[in-house]
Amino acid sequence: RDWGFEVAVPEAVSCALEGPDQGRKLAEWQAMGLTRISGKAFPANENGKDLFLLMPAGRYGPAFLVTPNFYVLKAYNMSDLYALFIGHVSDRIAYGSGDFITAWGALGSLTRGDIARMQRALEAQGHDVGGADGLPGYKTRRSIGRWQDAQSQPSTCFPTSPLKATLR
């Protein structure tokens, strides 16, 4: 089974659906409009199996539907970016794949302290950010998206300088 697939996520689909605890069957993701960015069909062996949305840079970078094998990679190193790197390198070796199609956006220059302050502000409002450690993991990203939705702001699911000024 593959580790994951780069996908296009329609704006109407909340980035707050990210996380290993929010798996859905492939058909459910497809019904929401998620498609492989390559234009290829998903492998038939993925039908009926749970896949998980991963948006490591929120709306500012590539998005993925990952399989449980992605989380096997994370058993060695809990970093989403580490597991993405290993999975992507394996695809490049096995299939001759190129770069991710979606570009990584400029994410700014927030410090871990900046992100930790935002996390504490979100926690004070009842959000589960996974702990105020200054790292924008999936719980922090989706908490940002939920907060943005509640504020009637476009949800980006990623900490930014403008968000830092708002979330205190």
List each language-model region with its residue ranges.
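Cell-envelope/ECM-targeting effectors and their regulatory/trafficking segments
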Residues: A8, S14-R168
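Active-site-proximal binding-pocket segments
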Residues: R1-A8
